[in-house]
Structure formats: C-alpha cells, structure tokens
C-alpha cells in the first residue's frame, strides 16, 4: 500500500509539474505522457545488466510495438498503476491508446528481434540491440478505392521512449561523410535488470524531403538515410540507398561495440571472449568486413589476425530459403557506396576461391555479385535456422554445399515469443485465470503451462477459457466497428490470417476459399455457425501481385458485406494498417489461426505461436514451426492440409507443377478462380488488377496455390464443422494453451546462449 501511495504521489507530482493538474483532471494523452515519465524514472532506477561477455543483436528492424504496458508488467507495477488510475476515474487501457506505436519494423523478423531483447533482459543476460531510428518506418497503410495506399508513418513525438545519448560517430561513404546520433530505448526484463536498444540516426536527417505519400529523393543520403525502413528498391537508387543504410547501421554498430570493449579495458585480440555479435538475417552482414577493416587499418591487426578474431565473434541467423530474400549486391554498388570495404570483401572472396572451387559457395559470383549470406557462413562461427524443418532444409537442400564444408557450424534454434506481451499484456483475463488455476510459475517458466492439462476434464476450467475467448471476441467486434466501420457477429467463428502479404504465405488461397464459400451460400448452402474472415497485411509498394491480392480481398469484402443474402452468414474484413497493437487485439479473439504458407517456404513463423498461446486452433501446412506445434498438440488438436515440403521441393526440382492442370480437372477450383474476373467482381474492382492476378494463378502460380486448394477447402470445412461440438473445441483450446510453453522466447534465448553466445 505504501508503494502504491508513493506511485500515486509521484504521478501527481509529474502531472502537476507538466500540466498543473492532478491525475483525475488530466486527459488520456496528458496522462500517457505523465505515466511515460514515471515509467522512465522507474527504469532509470533499474540496474543495467553487466557481465564479462555481452551479445549485440544487430537487426535492420525491431518491431517493438507500444511499450507502456509491457514495461509496466516487467517492472511489476502494472496492477498498482491500473488501480491508482481507476481510483482517479481513469482507465489504463484508454491511456495506452494515446501511445504512438514505434515504426521500426515490418514483419516477423522485426517482431522476433523485439521478443528476443525482452527475453535476453528477462534472463539477466548482458545484451543490446543495434538498429536504425526510422522516422517514418515502413509506411502507414490507407485503403482507398479498394487499393492499398502508402503514407508516411509519423510516430516520433517530443516525449517518447527514445533517449538521446549524446554519442556521435562519423561514417564515411568514400569521400562522403555523415555524423550519426545515438538514441537508446531502455529494455527492462521481467523482474530483472536493464539492457538497451541502440538506434542510430543521422544528425542532418530532413523529414521535409518526403513530398507525396512515401516519395522522396533517394540520392540525398546526407538527409534521407533514416527516413524509411526498406525504401523501394525497384531501381538503382533504391538499391544503393539500402546499401547505404546497411553500412550506416553496421559502421556505427562496430564503432560502438569496440568503444565499449575498450572502455572495459579489454584487449581487442580477446574480442571473442567478451563479445558475441548475432547477425539477424543478411542485412547486417557488412559488420564482418567493417570490423576487419577497423582492426587492420586502425588497430594494427594483420589481416589474418583480424579475420580470425572476427570469425570467432560473429554468428548468423538465417530466416529464409526464398532466393530473393538472400541479399546479393552487385560488386559495383558496394564499390560505389563503401569503396573502403571493397578490398576487404575481395580479399575474403579470394581466400574462399583458393580453398573451394564450387561456384555455389563463392562470395563474389561470376556475375560480379556479392552474396551476403556466404560472407556470414564462411566468416562466422555459427549458422542457425529458426525451426526444425527449416534447419533441415538448409542443411539438406538450400545450404547443403556449405553444410558439407562446415557441418559443425549449423544448428537449429526454433523461434519463440515473449509471453509477457503475448499473454500477460494482450490477454489480462486469460493470464489472470491461468494464475488462479495453475499458479504464476508459468510467467518465469513457460513449460509450467502444461499443468493446465490436469484440468482438461474440468468443466469449469473449459467453460472459463471459452468464455474469456467470447469476451475478447466481443471487445474486438467493438474495436473493428470503431476502426473499420464493419459490424461483425461475436457469435461467429473468427478465422484470422494476419502477416506480411506475400504469395508464399498464400493469402490468395484463403481468398479463393472465401469465394468458394460465398458461392456456396449464394447457392443455398448456408453454414451452421456464421463465419468471420479477418485479414491484416501490408504489401511492399513495389510488389504488384501482392497489391492485387489486397485489391481482391477489399473487393470481396465489399461484395460479401453488402449482400443481404450472404452477410448474415459470412463477413470479411481486412483491417487497415495492421501493426503490433492491432495484433494484440486480434490474436486473443481468434478461433482458427491461418498458417497456410507453401510447405518448405516459411522458415518458422511466430504468429502461429501467439495464436496457439491464446487458445486458437491452427489450420496450416506442414511448414515452419507448424510442424513442431503439430508434434506437441497431436493430430486431434490441429488441422494440417496440403503437400509436404519434400513433395514441394521435388516439384521445384523437376519444374513439373502446372497450375492450369489443377484448374482444368477441378470444377471447384475453376469456379473460384474464374470468379476473380466475373462480371460481379469486375463491377466493383479494377480490371487490370484482377486480370493480372487471375493470369498469375493460371499461368504461373509460383507458390502452388492450386496444388493445395482442394485439400484446404476440405480440411477448413472440417474445422468449421468441428467447432459445432463446443465440448470438443474447448478441449482443443486448452491443449493448445497448455502446450505453448515450448515456444517461449526465454527458451529460445537460453538455447542461443548455451550453444552460441556462451555468456556467463
């Protein structure tokens, strides 16, 4: 009680000083700023985690989401503060709405990095993130005329989690020099100490460069480097800008790391004993040649010494087997952007070429392109995949040539999620019920969720879990009505697919199912329980087919929701500007989690884990972490469909998949695909977009939508039928929650530390 009084007194003092008001008289926006200040003060009192060895997690993106709720939970003051605000007629959830969401990431890669930082701090490990401070992030998604429009996402406010450290470094791009400014965001562990997320900005950044939408002068690098995450790279200027950004990040990161090591008094020759650098995907790869450059040109190392030290310091996480996502930069671009790295990269490449003749493992290929992943594998000490099946595909197929050379470097670290955000913060009701039922040990040791299995025949427990889900669905209905203007039925089945828009994730297959179901209802076959399909996804502005898929979904939602024959039985909504905050509303309300990527293409996925933890049942392919979810929950608590990865890989090897064959032999597939260009759809949508998507499915279909479509329809219909058996469904929900403990990022990080970083 005394602590609570102190907290209330402190907050009143802060709001009094800022606004001349007490808590009760403040607006939600004012209270957000006050609580932000209070939280930052509490974090400043939290000891920084220290140790002999430290990990630096370098990533192009950190999709951290809003931080207020998470920080309050980790500091252990969420409940107290919530009660104080309630006492003063205020609601913490309303205050959280006033917080802008940092726009520092895009998809699973950035969200994983954020979960990892939370777990590193929670486990008391010394570890900081290194990235860039994007002013407008990826983009803000706005729907107009059934199309995605991109606008700048202006999120940085005067009062924010960003702390200007005053630290500056110089970064040279040949003769062009820029000065960086370092901003830190504090990362507090759950009931533990503090680490940092280091975000570099440029001193001369100019937001006024952005004129219309997200268009800006890509060549003004002294002003534009930190404006956007993943600027459009469909032209040479865009490609060069990405290299500028990547080098800016790693040059700053390398200087910061070496500065910290020197300040601790360590000899740089002992760098691997004091530093582990985790390279998150290929974007930070240039940290390897950059460290070698600094050590040889500024620290007196020989080339052999520098390569040896750096190779024992850097480790690489592979996140994809998609060829287009494994960066390959023309050597001429690197020569132009960072001429000082050119001789280092050539030296690294020559050493590989002398040792290995296989063209597939060269750093610089015959077309004079630099393969970034190849630098990571040759000159790092660890290569990890992010799910069991993904790592096996890397070893046996995609990176097999490297695996034969370095079998000892390859290891698997199945991804995880932080339960603080994805349970304690986003579903207070479920977290409170679990604590009441099995105790609160699961908050520190997620495997304790298994205790829930002891209650799988306890009707009161089953009913409570089901009722919490209904509550979250009702809350989501209200939120979507407010945000999207669509009225949903809380008693319908919520079938949700939220993730980056990409053909391999196959939102287009879900769209074809929805068309099939729409036509069934029009033909008089009505579902027993109404259906609600929810999508959330952004498409890269230069990715035309992805834009077309969004167009089809928006057109279909217009047709379905405005058809009086269909809308009582089925609704479709694509939420605008899907982000972490939206995910925190959608995930607890989901019944069926759509994880339908083409087998072999999704490295892991983490959305599947978040949905599972919140009691949704997975409908998915045998891909990524779905495979491990399947193993944990068993055949009766998941819906698996489609061809397996071996079959898919064989189709690619033989180049024998012809989508038109499936279209011709299946009336169901033909009817659904043809509907895309039917009069009914063309009346609402744009002919160019719809015909392009139609032709893509019929003539190319690179990610084999039509291969799995019939099985998808059959298994999804089965899932909807099973939902009618409430008792069965409640047990499925319970088993999924109970078995989710394995997917805690605390477990993942403990494994990284045990096998890769070896921090004390």
Where are these regions (language model features)?
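A conserved ligand/cofactor-binding region detector
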Residues: 1-760
């Amino acid at each position: 009680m005394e602590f609570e009084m102190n907290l209330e007194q402190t907050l009143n003092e802060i709001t009094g000083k800022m606004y001349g008001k007490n808590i009760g008289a403040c607006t939600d926006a004012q209270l957000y700023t006050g609580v932000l200040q209070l939280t930052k003060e509490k974090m400043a009192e939290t000891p920084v985690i220290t140790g002999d060895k430290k990990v630096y997690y370098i990533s192009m993106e950190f999709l951290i989401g809003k931080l207020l709720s998470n920080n309050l939970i980790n500091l252990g003051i969420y409940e107290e503060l919530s009660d104080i605000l309630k006492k003063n007629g205020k609601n913490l959830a309303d205050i959280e709405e006033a917080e802008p969401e940092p726009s520092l990431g895009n998809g699973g890669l950035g969200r994983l990095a954020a979960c990892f930082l939370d777990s590193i701090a929670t486990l008391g490990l010394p570890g900081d993130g290194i990235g860039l401070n994007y002013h407008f992030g990826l983009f803000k998604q706005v729907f107009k005329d059934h199309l995605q429009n991109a606008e700048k996402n202006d999120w940085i406010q005067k009062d924010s989690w960003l702390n200007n450290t005053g630290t500056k470094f110089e970064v040279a791009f040949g003769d062009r020099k820029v000065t960086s400014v370092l901003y830190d965001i504090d990362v507090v562990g759950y009931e533990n100490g503090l680490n940092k997320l280091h975000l570099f900005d440029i001193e001369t950044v100019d937001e006024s460069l952005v004129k219309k939408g997200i268009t800006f002068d890509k060549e003004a690098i002294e002003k534009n480097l930190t404006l956007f995450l993943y600027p459009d790279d469909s032209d040479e200027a865009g490609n060069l800008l990405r290299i500028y950004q990547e080098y800016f990040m790693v040059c700053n990161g390398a200087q910061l790391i070496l500065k910290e090591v020197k300040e601790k008094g360590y000899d740089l020759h002992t760098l691997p004993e004091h530093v582990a650098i985790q390279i998150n995907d290929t974007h930070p790869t240039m940290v390897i040649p950059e460290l070698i450059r600094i050590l040889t040109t500024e620290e007196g190392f020989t080339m052999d010494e520098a390569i040896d030290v750096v190779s024992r310091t850097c480790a690489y996480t592979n996140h994809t087997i998609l060829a287009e996502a494994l960066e390959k930069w023309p050597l001429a671009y690197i020569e132009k952007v960072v001429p000082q790295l050119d001789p280092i990269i050539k030296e690294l490449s020559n050493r590989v070429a002398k040792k290995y003749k296989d063209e597939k493992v060269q750093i610089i290929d015959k077309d004079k392109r630099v393969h970034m992943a190849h630098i990571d594998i040759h000159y790092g000490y660890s290569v990890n995949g992010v799910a069991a099946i993904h790592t096996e595909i890397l070893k046996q197929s995609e990176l097999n040539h490297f695996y034969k050379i370095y079998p000892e470097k390859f290891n698997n670290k199945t991804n995880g999620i932080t339960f603080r955000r994805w349970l304690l913060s986003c579903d207070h009701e479920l977290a409170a019920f679990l604590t009441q039922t099995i105790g609160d040990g699961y908050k520190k040791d997620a495997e304790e969720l298994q205790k829930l299995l002891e209650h799988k025949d306890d009707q009161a427990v089953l009913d409570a879990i089901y009722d919490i889900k209904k509550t979250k669905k009702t809350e989501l209905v209200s939120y979507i009505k407010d945000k999207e203007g669509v009225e949903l039925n809380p008693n319908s089945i919520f079938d949700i697919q939220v993730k980056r828009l990409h053909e391999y994730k196959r939102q287009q297959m879900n769209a074809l199912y929805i068309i099939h179901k729409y036509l069934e209802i029009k033909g008089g076959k009505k579902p027993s329980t109404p259906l609600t399909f929810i999508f959330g996804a952004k498409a890269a502005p230069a990715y035309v087919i992805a834009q077309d898929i969004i167009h089809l979904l928006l057109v279909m939602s217009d047709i379905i929701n405005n058809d009086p024959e269909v809308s009582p039985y089925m609704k479709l909504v694509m939420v605008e500007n899907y982000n972490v905050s939206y995910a925190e509303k959608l995930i607890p309300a989901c019944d069926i989690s759509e994880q339908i990527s083409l087998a072999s293409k999704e490295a892991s996925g983490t959305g599947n884990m978040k949905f599972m933890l919140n009691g949704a049942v997975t409908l998915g392919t045998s891909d990524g972490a779905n495979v491990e979810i399947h193993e944990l929950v068993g055949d009766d608590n998941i819906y698996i469909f489609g061809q397996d990865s071996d079959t898919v890989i064989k189709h690619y090897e033989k180049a024998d998949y012809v989508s038109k064959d499936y279209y011709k032999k299946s009336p169901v597939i033909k009817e659904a695909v043809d509907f895309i260009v039917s009069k009914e759809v063309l009346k609402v949508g744009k002919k160019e977009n719809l015909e392009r998507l139609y032709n893509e499915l019929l003539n190319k279909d690179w990610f084999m939508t039509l291969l799995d479509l019939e099985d998808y329809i059959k298994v999804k219909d089965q899932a909807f039928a099973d939902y009618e058996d409430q008792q069965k469904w409640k047990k499925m929900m319970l088993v999924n929650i109970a078995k989710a403990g394995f997917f805690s990022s605390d477990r993942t990080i403990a494994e990284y530390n045990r096998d890769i970083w070896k921090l004390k």
